[in-house]
């Protein structure tokens, strides 16, 4: 069976894509655990902030996380399927009406807050349903 070049590339990309990615949206506050290798040592560094953008699709999908530390705005772009990302934790789910939150770059203090989504935390909601159905 002869496969086309694009079919071969797609197959290779699907093999390299992570399957266990935590679902998150724009506006969510996340904690990204990154593996850092220095010589023969490996450690995990945590970067927490608000997701302000998601771009691309497939293996080349990226997301940007913005945070303010010591009065300075910091932004970092991560490859979603990178082997360097150990895990992504969703701390708080945000309710926004934009697909890109670049306006947060120039804000500080209360102006940089994102409204919390009502009825959020899907995982805790599932636990509540199990408790209610058990009674």
Swiss-Prot record:
<keyword id="KW-0689">Ribosomal protein</keyword>
<dbReference type="GO" id="GO:0003735">
    <property type="term" value="F:structural constituent of ribosome"/>
</dbReference>
<dbReference type="InterPro" id="IPR018257">
    <property type="entry name" value="Ribosomal_bL19_CS"/>
</dbReference>
<keyword id="KW-0687">Ribonucleoprotein</keyword>
<dbReference type="GO" id="GO:0006412">
    <property type="term" value="P:translation"/>
</dbReference>
<dbReference type="InterPro" id="IPR001857">
    <property type="entry name" value="Ribosomal_bL19"/>
</dbReference>
<dbReference type="Pfam" id="PF01245">
    <property type="entry name" value="Ribosomal_L19"/>
</dbReference>
<comment type="function">
    <text>This protein is located at the 30S-50S ribosomal subunit interface and may play a role in the structure and function of the aminoacyl-tRNA binding site.</text>
</comment>
<dbReference type="GO" id="GO:0022625">
    <property type="term" value="C:cytosolic large ribosomal subunit"/>
</dbReference>
<protein>
    <recommendedName>
        <fullName>Large ribosomal subunit protein bL19</fullName>
    </recommendedName>
</protein>
<dbReference type="InterPro" id="IPR038657">
    <property type="entry name" value="Ribosomal_bL19_sf"/>
</dbReference>
<dbReference type="InterPro" id="IPR008991">
    <property type="entry name" value="Translation_prot_SH3-like_sf"/>
</dbReference>
<comment type="similarity">
    <text>Belongs to the bacterial ribosomal protein bL19 family.</text>
</comment>
């Amino acid at each position: 069976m002869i496969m086309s070049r694009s079919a071969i590339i797609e197959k290779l990309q699907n093999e390299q894509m992570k399957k266990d990615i935590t679902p998150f949206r724009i506006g969510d506050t996340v904690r990204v655990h990154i593996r850092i290798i220095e010589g023969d040592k490996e450690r995990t560094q945590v970067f927490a902030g608000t997701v302000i953008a998601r771009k691309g699709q497939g293996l080349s999908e990226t997301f940007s996380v913005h945070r303010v530390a010591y009065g300075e705005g910091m932004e970092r772009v991560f490859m979603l399927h990178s082997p360097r990302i150990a895990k992504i934790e969703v701390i708080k789910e945000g309710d926004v009406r934009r697909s890109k939150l670049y306006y947060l770059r120039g804000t500080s203090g209360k102006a940089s807050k994102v409204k919390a989504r009502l009825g959020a935390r899907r995982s805790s909601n599932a636990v509540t349903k199990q408790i209610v159905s058990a009674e």
